[in-house]
Amino acid sequence: DYFSKQPNHIAKLKDLIIKGKAGGTPSSTVAEYYNGDIPFLSISDMTKQGKYVEFTEKHISENGLANSSAWIVPSNSLILSMYASVGLVCINKVPLATSQAMFSMVLKDCNMLDYIYYYLNFFRETQIHRLLETGTQSNINADTVRDIEIPFYSNILVFVKTLQAIENRLNNEKDMLSRLMDLKTYLLSSLFI
């Protein structure tokens, strides 16, 4: 197991980011705060799109942004869910805003983006349960996220390239499967008309 090896060094997330903070949700009772031009990320967007988020279902307006604690998260930032689906992580490919349920991080070194993404996924599966605050809904807070320790190894770029190649292959196979399913549906509908 790669992450069970001894790391060269360990750094806390807060030491790897230029900016890291939760978002905010504009009041839902003010219609003018919504349906603007600013993409507004939801857990649903993250679960549907996976690693890279390229669009959002909801949008907020400039007024919605100004009248909440939401902020514009620049492209190629890491976004981690602190409430629902705790620990779910994505990389945004477009600037967007998030709710207070998400902690967004702008990294100091963009070359580490994929590595930290992969590590946070591993962390979610193996360790995040130890950090959960219990209550009506288990969650973590921003300070907990900032203090997550990230191990660094001498060959992480090779590791990342290997995982990216696997991801690319999986995505290609999913695309092929989707096309085959479409072809099957078309042929069946042609046969029975």
Provide a role label for each language-model segment.
Residues 1-24, 40, 154-155, 164-191:
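Non-catalytic DNA-recognition/assembly elements of restriction-modification systems
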Residues 3-49, 64-69, 130:
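Low-complexity, Lys/Gly-biased intrinsically disordered segments
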Residues 21, 81-84, 107-110, 121-128, ...:
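Hydrophobic alpha-helix feature that most strongly marks membrane-spanning transmembrane helices
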Residues 42-43, 58-122, 133:
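A short beta-sheet element
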Residues 47-59:
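Short, basic/aromatic beta-hairpin or loop at an interaction surface
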Residues 82, 96-103, 133-157:
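A short glycine-rich beta-alpha junction/loop motif
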